[in-house]
Design a protein with these regions (language model features):
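ATP-dependent carboxylate-amine ligase
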Residues: 1-152
Length: 152
């Protein structure tokens, strides 16, 4: 513990508020956003989905999954596995962002670019939702989140 009192450690952990697109919680209008768009790979996305799905109301949660990069020959299979996992977990509302997710077999909404989602949300934003957002850094999914109205 390096001589740091337990109470001080607890206070530091409890007061930590991420602001770097890594597991960042924020209010955007009437929505609560969980933004984890700094980096993603199949294992981190799977773990995040498995953690979020049982805790968030399926009817009130919108999942936004952005393409996972640098997977080489495994890319197609990995993206299909993520979509299959989403369905297995009972995820009802999702937007898949990027050409790799668009190529999968899925029942969800799909857009090719983050800017397409940002434009759609600027015209017709979701409301009163929990919005889970995760994808590779290069997808810049925070641009879509930024299109949502700020909290008044």
């Amino acid at each position: 513990h390096f001589g740091v009192p337990a109470a001080q450690i607890r206070e530091a952990i409890e007061s930590y508020a991420p602001d770097n697109s890594r597991s960042q919680w924020m209010a955007k209008g009437s929505n609560q956003v969980i933004l984890d768009a700094y980096n993603a790979n199949p294992s981190s996305m799977s773990a995040s989905l498995r953690n979020a799905a049982p805790r968030l109301n399926a009817d009130e949660t919108l999942y936004v999954a952005g393409d996972l990069f640098e997977l080489g020959d495994y890319a197609e299979q990995a993206h299909q596995e993520m979509v299959d996992l989403m369905q297995e977990l009972g995820i009802v509302h999702a937007v898949l962002v990027g050409p790799l997710f668009a190529a999968t077999k899925h029942p969800y909404t799909s857009v090719l670019r983050t800017d397409d989602l940002a434009e759609a949300w600027s015209q017709d934003p979701p409301s009163c939702r929990s919005i889970w957002v995760k994808g590779s850094r290069g997808m810049a999914l925070e641009r879509a989140v930024n299109a949502l109205a700020p909290t008044a």
